[in-house]
């Protein structure tokens, strides 16, 4: 929440920013970073894939947890990176991009971005593992 005081004759009031707004912003920003294949662990991605197919949309907050105060936010990200990237460099770029984007959009100071790299996406693998739609059914 930010306190918007009267300055130069403007109207004062309070602005509150919901956790979901920060989580969505962080999730979308994280997916923009080169080397980040996806967010969330195997279980959350599998559950999310089923939910996304039913709802016909993707959840930008999957793999993102936030704590939002009046002026600050802390962000935790569960990340899947592409095979071959330098994880430390990707994490640094991810941390900076997410913090900068959340601050620019919300005005909140991002005090920390914690990153857990849970998996590596191998070349040729896809989000739909186990869902080989291109292969014919084995049993008819």
Language-model regions, residue ranges each:
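Beta-strand elements of well-folded, non-transmembrane domains
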Residues: 70, 81-83, 102
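Short, non-transmembrane amphipathic alpha-helical segments
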Residues: 87-110
């Amino acid at each position: 929440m930010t306190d918007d005081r009267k300055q130069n004759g403007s109207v004062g009031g309070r602005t509150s920013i919901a956790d979901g707004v920060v989580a969505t912003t962080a999730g979308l920003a994280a997916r923009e970073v080169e080397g980040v294949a996806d967010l969330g662990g195997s279980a959350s991605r599998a559950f999310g894939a089923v939910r996304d197919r039913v709802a016909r949309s993707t959840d930008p907050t999957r793999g993102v947890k936030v704590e939002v105060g009046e002026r600050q936010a802390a962000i935790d990200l569960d990340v899947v990176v592409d095979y071959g990237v330098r994880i430390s460099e990707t994490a640094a770029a991810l941390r900076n991009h997410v913090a900068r984007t959340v601050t620019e959009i919300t005005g909140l100071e991002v005090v920390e971005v914690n990153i857990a790299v849970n998996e590596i996406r191998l070349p040729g693998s896809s989000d739909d593992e186990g869902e080989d739609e291109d292969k014919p059914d084995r049993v008819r």
